[in-house]
UniProtKB/Swiss-Prot annotation:
Comment on protein domains: Composed of three domains: the N-terminal N domain, which is responsible for interactions with the ribosome, the central G domain, which binds GTP, and the C-terminal M domain, which binds the RNA and the signal sequence of the RNC.
Name of the protein described by the UniProt record: Signal recognition particle 54 kDa protein
The organism's place on the tree of life at top rank: Archaea
Main location: cytoplasm
A biological-process GO annotation: SRP-dependent cotranslational protein targeting to membrane
Gene: srp54
Broadest EC class assigned to this enzyme: hydrolase
Cited PANTHER family: SIGNAL RECOGNITION PARTICLE 54K PROTEIN SRP54 (PTHR11564), SIGNAL RECOGNITION PARTICLE SUBUNIT SRP54 (PTHR11564:SF5)
GO molecular function annotations of the record: 7S RNA binding; ATP hydrolysis activity; GTP binding; GTPase activity
Species this chain originates from: Halobacterium salinarum (strain ATCC 700922 / JCM 11081 / NRC-1) (Halobacterium halobium)
Function in brief: Involved in targeting and insertion of nascent membrane proteins into the cytoplasmic membrane. Binds to the hydrophobic signal sequence of the ribosome-nascent chain (RNC) as it emerges from the ribosomes. The SRP-RNC complex is then targeted to the cytoplasmic membrane where it interacts with the SRP receptor FtsY.
Binding site for GTP: 104-111, 184-188, 242-245
Length: 460
């Protein structure tokens, strides 16, 4: 993920300040050098890095920490505020009628981003439509149509036309009933004059309310020139950063934001249309520093529960807080967890669970955990209705039968039963809580954000 190395290395450096009530110049120098190293390796512009370093050094040594604040927390707060300032505000995207035009080089992820954004708007109660104007790239129409179908949104394109400007004009007319028009434009392998001329013509027809530059997180220092030319041509209002699930460094996209004096609008990761989120600087840096993001976590949980309930109208997640917790319920929770997205992203949103704890886990921990969950589902397929309803009734002979039927080891069947028992006990604790108790618990988790945690319901 973008700047992930910075988060990992900085957390380790800040941990060396634990137990100190005062901070020395040597301590600050060590933290600042770690920030410089990580940002420069992430392709952030050197001038930005130097400005940030100077500000952190000055504030850390001159500002008096509030009473009772440790040296680590004092520096952490300053680093947090300065990094939030570095990434900038979020691009305003009002939930109202509007036209958005996407620009960028070929391969930056514009077509996928158009579908993801359309899906996002649809979940906010608006009716979006994608207008595909790319007549340059082979297969562009087919890809866009397929992605729009996955997002379940309106789509317009003309596969036999070679006039992108006319397609844009016709597309807006054909989808006039839509609240939000997302116009996907053609890219090239480089910034060519014909690309700039074409996108300027489309802009004249579309008259977008905002133009977003789509950037691959791996763009590197080339982002500066690209951003400058697109901004001079059509004016860039915001940036959508894509492919954050890869090993990309991501700093070049921050450079582009600074170069165009714009902001970040969306972050994209993964191949599905749901793999998108609005950029929230506070939440982004909070996750980066291992402090969690309860707001984003809550939104993902609510969305995942809704999607899981849509798949099975007889299942109501509120029933979990009332009666017995069965294996059916556990399975639905696992499906909801899967709907939340990659586990490592979810973990980063839990205060005390991301950050330092994630650094300590093996690189394949998330893959192993998801594989175990898939194994659990296979085991449940081999269980009877009575066993699913009352797992406590499952004895040794039944474990042997279930293992044979599922092709899973007997130990894995026992592991599932133990996992269910642990989750059932957790649900009982929640059942006894009032709203005030829940809020106090979540507040405590937020306060403990940087301090590490343990386990994830026994899954690790």
């Amino acid at each position: 993920m973008v700047l992930d190395d910075l988060g990992s290395s900085l957390r380790g450096t800040l941990d060396t300040l634990r137990g100190k009530s005062r901070i020395s110049e040597e301590d600050v120098d060590k933290v600042v050098k770690e920030i410089q190293r990580s940002l420069l390796q992430a392709d952030v512009d050197v001038d930005l890095v130097m400005d940030l370093s100077e500000s952190i050094t000055e504030r850390s040594l001159e500002e008096e920490p509030p009473g009772g604040t440790s040296a680590r927390d004092h520096v952490l707060r300053i680093v947090y505020e300065e990094l939030v300032g570095l990434v900038g505000d979020s691009t305003p995207i009002p939930l109202e009628e509007q036209t958005i035009m996407l620009a960028g080089l070929q391969g930056s992820g514009k077509t996928t981003t158009a579908a993801k954004m359309a899906w996002w708007f649809s979940k906010k109660g608006l009716r979006p439509a994608i207008v595909q104007t790319d007549t340059f790239r082979p297969g562009a129409y087919e890809q866009a149509a397929e992605m729009a179908d996955r997002a379940e949104v309106d789509f317009y394109g003309e596969p036999d036309s070679d006039d992108p400007v006319q397609i844009a004009r016709d597309g807006l007319a054909a989808t006039a009933d839509a609240d939000v028009h997302i116009v996907d434009t053609a890219g090239r392998h480089a910034l060519e004059d014909d690309l700039i001329a074409e996108i300027e013509e489309i802009e004249g027809v579309v008259e977008p309310d905002r133009s977003l530059l789509v950037l691959d997180a791996a763009i590197g220092q080339g982002a500066k020139q690209q951003a400058r030319q697109f901004d001079a041509s059509i004016g860039i209002d915001g940036v959508a950063i894509t492919k954050l699930d890869g090993t990309a460094k991501g700093g070049g996209s921050l450079t582009a934001v600074n170069e165009t004096d714009s902001t970040i609008a969306f972050l994209g990761s993964g191949e599905t249309v749901q793999d998108i989120e609005r950029f929230e600087p506070d939440s982004f840096i909070s996750r980066l520093l291992g402090m969690g993001d309860l707001k984003q976590l809550t939104e993902r949980v609510e969305r995942a529960m809704e999607e899981t309930q849509d798949d099975d109208e007889d299942w109501d997640p509120e029933d979990l807080m009332k009666g017995e917790f069965t294996l059916h319920d556990m399975r639905k929770q696992m499906q909801a967890m899967d709907n939340m997205g990659p586990l490592d992203q979810v973990m980063d949103m839990i205060p005390g669970m991301g950050g330092g704890l994630m650094d300590e886990l093996p690189d394949d921990a998330m893959d192993v955990t998801q594989e175990r969950m898939r194994g659990f589902e296979v085991i449940m397929d081999s269980m009877t209705e009575a066993e699913m309803a009352d797992p406590r009734s499952v004895g040794a002979s039944q474990i042997r039968r279930i293992a044979r039927g599922s092709g899973q080891p007997e130990d894995r069947v026992r592991e599932l039963l133990d996992q269910h028992k642990m989750m059932a006990q957790t649900m009982q604790q929640f059942q006894g809580m009032g709203d005030g108790d829940m809020q106090r618990m979540m507040s405590k988790m937020q306060q403990q954000g940087g301090g590490g945690g343990g386990g994830f319901g026994g899954m690790f």
